[in-house]
């Protein structure tokens, strides 16, 4: 296995209530489980003092990028990918609904693929969401599979491991700044010939999550945009 050198990237929007606990837990784990690491928080124009809290409480222990205005999860992660200094990047949601220890399952597959994605819906995965969110998520996943990229149980899981050079290659072609960036990147990975592994993980439901019903409508619009971009030839041609 390669050395465990990792950027752990948290996109954050109005996460002042829980970001400190997330970072404390992640730092404690990283100190004992990684050879080299950096924790990177990209504040996406928060209005609740998230960035100030991170800077004041963690100082040099955590790298902080402040975006002046909200651009969307995809835009925030792109900023983090551009700034990452380690050869692998783990994307994780700021609520740590997927325990950081689940990284071990992804890392075990890193020798076989430059992209390893966690999956709440794959056989062996655990999804502790309310029934309505499970239903809407499953419906959306079917639409994504039929319209953009197939073969995955869960494109939207926020826990993903990318080799940094591959992530940067994909983000050069990224056009979606919202939640749809997840399946856009996987579609690009397929077109550019990068292997992707999907690993079942355990996802806990955290109160106060930031995904609203409106977000599902936004994702629907992003699916339409990606289909339009494909028709207009705005993505790289698929490699044979």
Where in the sequence are the language-model features?
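Short, well-formed alpha-helical segments that are part of the catalytic scaffolds
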Residues: 15-30
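Cell-envelope/extracellular polymer assembly enzymes that use nucleotide-activated donors
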Residues: 5-7, 38, 184
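Conserved donor nucleotide-binding strand/loop of the catalytic core
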Residues: 36-40, 51-83
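Donor nucleotide-sugar binding loop of glycosyltransferases
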Residues: 15-18, 46, 73, 99
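A conserved acidic beta->alpha catalytic loop
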Residues: 43-51, 96
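Catalytic donor-sugar/metal-binding loop of nucleotide-sugar-dependent glycosyltransferases
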Residues: 151, 175-177, 186-203
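Acceptor/aglycone-binding surface of glycosyltransferases and processive sugar-polymer synthases
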Residues: 67-83, 88, 100-179, 206-215, ...
């Amino acid at each position: 296995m390669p050395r465990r050198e990792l950027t752990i990237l948290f996109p954050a929007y109005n996460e002042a209530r829980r970001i400190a606990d997330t970072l404390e837990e992640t730092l404690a784990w990283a100190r004992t489980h990684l050879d080299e690491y950096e924790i990177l928080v990209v504040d996406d124009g928060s209005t609740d003092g998230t960035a100030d809290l991170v800077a004041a409480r963690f100082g040099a222990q955590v790298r902080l990028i402040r975006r002046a205005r909200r651009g969307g999860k995809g835009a925030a992660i792109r900023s983090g990918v551009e700034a990452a200094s380690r050869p692998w990047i783990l994307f994780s949601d700021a609520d740590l609904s997927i325990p950081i220890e689940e990284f071990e399952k992804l890392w075990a597959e890193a020798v076989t693929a430059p992209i390893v994605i966690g999956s709440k819906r794959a056989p062996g995965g655990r999804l502790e969401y309310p029934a309505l969110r499970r239903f809407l998520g499953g419906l959306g996943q079917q639409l994504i599979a039929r319209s953009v990229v197939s073969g995955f149980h869960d494109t939207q899981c926020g826990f993903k491991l990318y080799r940094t050079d591959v992530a940067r290659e994909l983000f050069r072609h990224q056009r979606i700044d919202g939640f749809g960036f997840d399946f856009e990147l996987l579609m690009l990975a397929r077109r550019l010939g990068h292997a992707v592994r999907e690993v079942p993980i355990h996802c806990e439901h955290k109160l106060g999550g930031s995904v609203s019903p409106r977000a599902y409508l936004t994702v629907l619009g992003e699916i339409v945009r990606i289909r339009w971009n494909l028709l207009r030839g705005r993505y790289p041609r698929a490699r044979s």
